[in-house]
């Protein structure tokens, strides 16, 4: 996934009411506590006395895999306890921010996309890792895993890439419902849609065959984060950043000027108007939507690889589904999901009183061995190519996911590698954002679709320009031209010119 999209992913999280966040923080109890810690050869600075590492993430379906790592870690380091707290995803940024302010931050935490990583560094949330992350340790990772402006700032390393390059969203197809609607080839194999028009035709056929009880398409946006996932069909249709709206080829936001976004709204609202989308879409959450899909309530769902481990837990008998890349507007993809040098995963808190133990756990989670177990558990790809072998897939849907992941990513430009001061430009969020606009369109509160997109584009462009001007006023050398890479071909890997 491009770092531009990651930046937008949890943006809405900071909008949660502070009072509600305080209540949630006070009432949240660790969901998993498994003993784990220092080895016979204890890391420097860590005593052999019992130590407890506070670990935060927002992973639910990935939880059992992390629990297994805690168990294995404990077997090797019996004096350390990893106390894991799994927070609610849409509250996570607020809860972490409140913990930082209160001085009660976890020792190790999964880094959220909001605030931006550079802002978290500036706020002093993260501990530099250089004293442990030696050249030898860095060499265990693929080339370009550590990059200035991504996970390194002013020469200091703050995190390591966790996920491997992969489209973070795919289309899941309920094979049983497709077969019931006759959407199969001559051999009886399900014909999964490749284009938007094929999606719409399939959705109509499935809804008709369901007689009012089954629908072609579904999602769950109760937590107000999933509507933009539907918009991600633009990511393979000519939008380099379908979630954030910024286009490096233009050096500006293109919500209105790139016609693909309005094309998608017409397509999606057309499906809604035809009655092909599950009616409860705005009142159920994503986890409920996944159960609906597994129990045959609707036939097509956008989601990530976490769906598969989730179904293994909630609907263990459900295996009759397929995984394909996100359908595109035309016959071929006009763009892809993108990656760039560097990457983000876990971080060690600057407030930790047990930095050596926290690093030990950080290093364990970022080892090749743990990465291989992650892939074998069906949790997705990791940064280490040797861990991402198709032979590790234990089910056909997971093998399909791995194939989609291995084929569906391209390298994007990384102007921040050439101009590190770009990370000092921090645009303010404008509201309503794309989530709010899509919700307004979906509920018919917004009727001028193009006007709403143009307004968002203008507001985002103005925020970007203001942030650049603010950085310049602080004496930071930044040039608006750095945000423009006109020679980027969206269908090919970009070779960074002048990269060191």
Give residue ranges: language-model regions:
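Conserved N-terminal structural module of periplasmic/extracytoplasmic solute-binding proteins
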Residues: 2-123, 135-137, 185, 192, ...
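Extracytoplasmic/periplasmic substrate-recognition and gating elements
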Residues: 49, 72-76, 102, 155, ...
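Short helix-initiation/N-cap motifs at beta->coil->alpha
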Residues: 86-95, 194-198, 281-291
């Amino acid at each position: 996934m491009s770092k531009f999209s990651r930046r937008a992913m949890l943006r809405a999280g900071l909008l949660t009411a502070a009072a509600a966040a305080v209540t949630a923080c006070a009432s949240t109890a660790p969901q998993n506590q498994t003993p784990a810690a220092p080895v016979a050869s204890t890391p420097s600075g860590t005593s052999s006395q019992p130590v407890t590492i506070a670990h935060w993430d927002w992973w639910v379906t990935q939880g059992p895999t992390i629990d297994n790592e805690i168990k294995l870690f404990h077997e090797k380091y019996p004096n350390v306890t990893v106390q894991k707290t799994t927070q609610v995803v849409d509250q996570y940024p607020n809860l972490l921010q409140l913990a930082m302010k209160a001085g009660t931050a976890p020792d190790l935490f999964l880094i959220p996309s909001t605030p931006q990583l550079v802002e978290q560094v500036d706020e002093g949330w993260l501990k530099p890792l250089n004293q442990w992350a030696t050249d030898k340790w860095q060499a265990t990772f693929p080339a370009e895993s550590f990059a200035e402006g991504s996970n390194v700032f002013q020469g200091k390393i703050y995190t390591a890439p966790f996920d491997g390059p992969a489209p973070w969203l795919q289309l899941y197809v309920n094979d049983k419902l497709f077969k019931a609607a006759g959407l199969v080839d001559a051999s009886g194999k399900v014909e999964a849609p490749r284009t938007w028009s094929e999606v719409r035709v399939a959705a109509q056929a499935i809804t008709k065959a369901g007689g009012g009880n089954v629908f072609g398409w579904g999602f769950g946006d109760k937590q107000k984060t999933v509507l933009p996932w539907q918009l991600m069909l633009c990511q393979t249709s000519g939008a380099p950043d379908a979630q954030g709206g910024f286009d490096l080829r233009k050096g500006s936001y293109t919500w209105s000027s790139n016609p693909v976004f309005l094309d998608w709204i017409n397509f999606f609202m057309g499906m809604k108007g035809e009655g092909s989308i599950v009616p409860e879409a705005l009142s159920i959450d994503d986890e409920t939507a996944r159960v609906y899909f597994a129990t045959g309530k609707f036939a097509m769902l956008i989601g990530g690889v976490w769906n598969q481990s989730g179904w293994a837990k909630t609907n263990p008998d459900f295996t009759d589904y397929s995984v394909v890349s996100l359908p595109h507007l035309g016959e071929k993809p006009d763009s892809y999901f993108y990656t760039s040098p560097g990457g983000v995963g876990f971080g060690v808190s600057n407030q930790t009183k047990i930095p050596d133990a926290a690093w030990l756990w950080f290093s364990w989670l970022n080892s090749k061995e743990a990465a291989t177990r992650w892939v074998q558990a069906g949790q997705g790809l990791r940064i280490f190519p040797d861990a991402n072998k198709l032979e590790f897939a234990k089910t056909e849907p997971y093998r399909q996911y791995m194939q989609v992941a291995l084929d569906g990513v391209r390298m994007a430009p990384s102007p921040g590698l050439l101009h590190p001061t770009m990370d000092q430009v921090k645009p303010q969020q404008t509201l309503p954002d794309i989530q709010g606009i899509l919700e307004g369109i979906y509920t018919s509160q917004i009727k001028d679709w193009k006007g709403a997109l143009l307004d968002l584009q203008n507001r985002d462009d103005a925020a970007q320009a203001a942030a650049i001007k603010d950085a310049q006023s602080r004496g930071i050398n930044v040039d608006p031209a750095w945000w423009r890479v006109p020679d980027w071909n969206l269908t090919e890997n970009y070779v960074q010119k002048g990269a060191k």
